[in-house]
Amino acid sequence: MISARQLGVKTRAFASSLSDNYQVTIDTLPNFLEEAYSNGETDGVIRIAPSIYGKFSADDIVSASLQATKNNKGQAAGILNAVIGSCSLHKSNSDASLLAWNLYCTWEAISDEMEFSPDIVTFCNTFSVLNAASEYPGDDQDFYKACAAQVLDRAQRYSKKLGGSKRRKLLNTLSRRPSKNHTAIQQIDALKKFSDDLEILFENDDLIVINKPSGMVLFHSKTTTNGKISRKKLKHFSDAQKGEDNHFDLSLVDILLELGIQLSTLNNEALGVVHRIDRGTSGAIVLAKTDEMHCKLVTAFFTRSVDKNYVALVPWKSCIDESNQIDQGQIDLEVGGRPALSTYKVIKRYPDNKALQLLVQTQTGRKHQVRVHCAKGLGRPIFLDTLYDDRTEKVFIHEKLSNPGKSLENKFFLHASSLRIDEFGIDVTANIPNWWHDILNEIE
């Protein structure tokens, strides 16, 4: 896996411009948090948070967060989640563990009166800190273990409430299903019935990493209601001949559940999901099997403790850079009004200036970040990405297939090529989809 350091790119930590030696007092704490958040949102707060460990009470920090955001409760929640999340990066710091627990308790205590409640990120970050603290030798082990269990129970109740009757019905249905103890070979064979590109990259008792095919939705939501399918249809699809032009719109979560793979319950929208990649994007995605691991993964993504690389195929000619000189660099461009940073490097140039293959690493995790940064930051929209490509390069791609038909529907040239989370032993590389090869061979 290639890291940002190997790309030779200087990365920026979104953070407050305040000096690390700045002496924070109870009077200046609101301004301190405000500047950190305004310069880098939660990333900025995570960086400066250690400087307030052991110096202020939970009441002080909650009050300062509301003052810093002028009672914008969404932003105040972001600050508090960032402070709690930062504690997970300092597991051996007893002040950090105690602060996370006290912040959680204080926030819960005022939630009804202030109409300002913790959310699933709060629960996940708090559990991650307390669970880690319970594993350190000492007199507080049992205390933190009990606290972690309490927070996890709260998270589960919160998720069930948000999920409503449909979620409860689904969980009840899954609990009655007979277990399917597939061997590794049987699982691989079962996955291949749905797509040749679908494969397990890593799996243990707590999580699973999948190479998701391009064109397959991760899970069905309100926007994909028409694509929802019944178990009967799902079974029919899995029994169908490979290669059939089948109209069933299968989600990755549907398939994993049908194969009997256990998934966590804390995401009220979709079991197991802790991060997302778009329908048209292929590649590595991790799903949680247990609620405990769900919390830990949410915290890992929240604190930017995950390395993600993408491969993108883009035009050689830029619509904003007349020099068309490109090698490597960084893209510092807001996405959806929020700070976003990516690093990139050209890893292949195709003959006759037809196309470039880029390696992109995201330093933040905004929706459509790579797609926006390629299109608007580099002036090179990803091939087939109709949402951000108003040019005609898609014609060039279609000409390279003898009979594209539906084969390119809901697909574009963006692939999550690698995923690394050191804490959980994840370091995987995902092969590019088979359909990429058909076109890449044509433009060589």
Where are these predicted regions, by residue range?
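Pentatricopeptide repeat
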Residues: 25, 29, 45, 58-61, ...
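Solenoid-repeat scaffolds in large eukaryotic assemblies
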Residues: 42-45, 58-61, 76, 96-100, ...
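Hydrophobic packing position at a conserved site in alpha-helical tandem repeat units
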Residues: 17-18, 36, 49-52, 56, ...
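Pseudouridine synthase
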Residues: 245, 249-256, 291, 302, ...
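RNA pseudouridine synthases
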Residues: 153-341, 345-351, 413, 418-420, ...
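N-terminal mitochondrial targeting presequence
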Residues: 1-20
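Short coil/turn connectors between adjacent alpha-helices in alpha-solenoid helical repeat scaffolds
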Residues: 53, 87-97, 133-146
